[in-house]
């Protein structure tokens, strides 16, 4: 099974509470989940947030919407991902997504999942050393066994926070594959980190809804 894990928290330093910001009448994270639901390969979507009180409103909102939630360490996000896999598996493939990307593209997700399947890679992504997709369309696909190996071995705080560096920094150990497009849009910004980013995606959603 392919398990999508949507990483989310309320305590963003640059734009606190952004994942629950209103986007065309619904929380931004639920708008993103609507788009993820259009990716057929994602058999299940789980929101992975922290066990801190600051994330209680997020967890309660997801539960009210019928979205599965796993809660774990705020800083050890890698451990949180393993916990989500254990709680909502069995899953042999995981997909890492972050909840600040309400313009997520189901087609890009499907292509990256298919690339990992076709190559048998331990890790596949549409970013990396050469980014061609806009920031905000990022998707990472990994074998659950590879991520378990990372979680069992690394104690580096950077690896624990950012989940996958232990994999893509070891190309001699883990098989990697990268999805690129012909047109280079790597400098385009569709993610939501700042107030102006939120204004932009609100304008997009208002135009479409």
Enumerate the predicted regions with their spans.
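Acidic metal-phosphate-binding loop of nucleotide-sugar-dependent transferases
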Residues: 74-75, 101-103
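Short aromatic-hydrophobic micro-motifs that form the base-stacking/packing surface
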Residues: 93-97
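N-terminal glycine-rich phosphate-binding loop and ensuing alpha1 helix
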Residues: 1-49
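Conserved alpha/beta core of the MobA/IspD/sugar-nucleotide pyrophosphorylase nucleotidyltransferase superfamily
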Residues: 142, 160-209
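Conserved donor-nucleotide/metal-binding helix-loop-beta segment in metal-dependent transferases, i.e.
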Residues: 83, 104-132
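Short alpha-helix within the catalytic core of nucleotide-sugar-dependent glycosyltransferases
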Residues: 34, 91, 106-117, 144, ...
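A recurrent flexible, glycine/aromatic-enriched loop bordering the glycosyltransferase active site
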Residues: 128-139, 183-184
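Conserved N-terminal catalytic core of the sugar/cofactor nucleotidyltransferase
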Residues: 30-92
């Amino acid at each position: 099974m392919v398990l999508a894990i949507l990483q989310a928290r309320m305590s963003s330093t640059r734009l606190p509470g952004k994942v629950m910001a209103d986007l065309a009448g619904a929380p931004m994270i639920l708008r993103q989940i609507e788009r993820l639901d259009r990716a057929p390969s994602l058999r299940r979507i789980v929101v992975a947030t922290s066990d801190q009180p600051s994330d209680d409103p997020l967890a309660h909102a997801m539960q009210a919407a019928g979205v599965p939630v796993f809660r774990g360490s705020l800083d050890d996000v890698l451990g949180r991902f393993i916990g989500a896999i254990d709680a909502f598996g069995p899953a042999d493939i995981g997909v890492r997504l972050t909840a600040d990307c309400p313009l997520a593209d189901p087609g890009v997700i499907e292509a990256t999942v298919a690339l990992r399947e076709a190559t048998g890679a331990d890790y596949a992504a549409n970013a990396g050393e050469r980014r061609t997709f806009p920031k905000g369309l990022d998707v990472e696909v990994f074998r659950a066994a590879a991520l378990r190996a990372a979680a069992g071995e690394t104690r580096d705080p950077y690896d624990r926070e950012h989940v996958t560096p232990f994999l893509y920094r070891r190309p001699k150990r883990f098989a990697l594959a990268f999805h690129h497009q012909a047109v280079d849009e790597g400098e385009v910004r569709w993610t939501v980190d700042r107030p102006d980013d939120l204004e932009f995606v609100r304008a997009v959603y208002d135009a479409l809804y």
